[in-house]
Amino acid sequence: MIQMQTNLEVADNSGARRVQCIKVLGGAGRRFASVGDIIVVSVKEAIPRGRVKKGDVHRAVIVRTAKEIRREDGSCIRFDRNAAVLINKQGEPIGTRIFGPVTRELRAKKYMKIISLAPEVL
C-alpha cells in the first residue's frame, strides 16, 4: 500500500536508488496504490552517470510492497521493502535490467516487458 510521501527502492538499473511517491495516478482523490499501479515519483538518491538524476520526476510502476497482496486462491504474498520500476510515458521501463522478484499481478496489468526482464516471477 503506497501513498504520497512513501519512499521506495528502485528495482532497475536506470540510475535511481531511492524515490519518493508524489502522486498516485488513477482517479480523482485516489489515496493508495498497490502492485501494478502507476505512481509519479521524485528521485531522491541516484548514482553518478545514471540515466536519471536526483530531483527528476518520473512515472513508476510498483513491483513489490510490504503490505501483503491477497490472491484469488486465498494465498498472500508480501516483501520486506517497497520497490518500483521507473517507466516512460509509453509505459516501457527506462532501465534495461530488473533486480529482485516481481509478482504475477503485473501480467494482468500488461507489463510484459518488466516480467520478461525480471529474474523471478512469484
Swiss-Prot record:
GO CC annotation terms, alphabetical: cytosolic large ribosomal subunit
GO biological processes: translation
Superkingdom of the organism of origin: Bacteria
This protein's UniProt keywords: Ribonucleoprotein, Ribosomal protein, RNA-binding, rRNA-binding
GO MF annotations in UniProt: large ribosomal subunit rRNA binding; structural constituent of ribosome
Keyword Transcription: no
Pfam families: Ribosomal_L14
PANTHER family xrefs: 50S/60S RIBOSOMAL PROTEIN L14/L23, LARGE RIBOSOMAL SUBUNIT PROTEIN UL14M
Quaternary structure (record): Part of the 50S ribosomal subunit. Forms a cluster with proteins L3 and L19. In the 70S ribosome, L14 and L19 interact and together make contacts with the 16S rRNA in bridges B5 and B8.
Recorded family membership: Belongs to the universal ribosomal protein uL14 family.
Role according to the record: Binds to 23S rRNA. Forms part of two intersubunit bridges in the 70S ribosome.
Name used for this protein in its record: Large ribosomal subunit protein uL14
Organism the protein comes from: Rhodospirillum centenum (strain ATCC 51521 / SW)
Gene that produces this protein: rplN
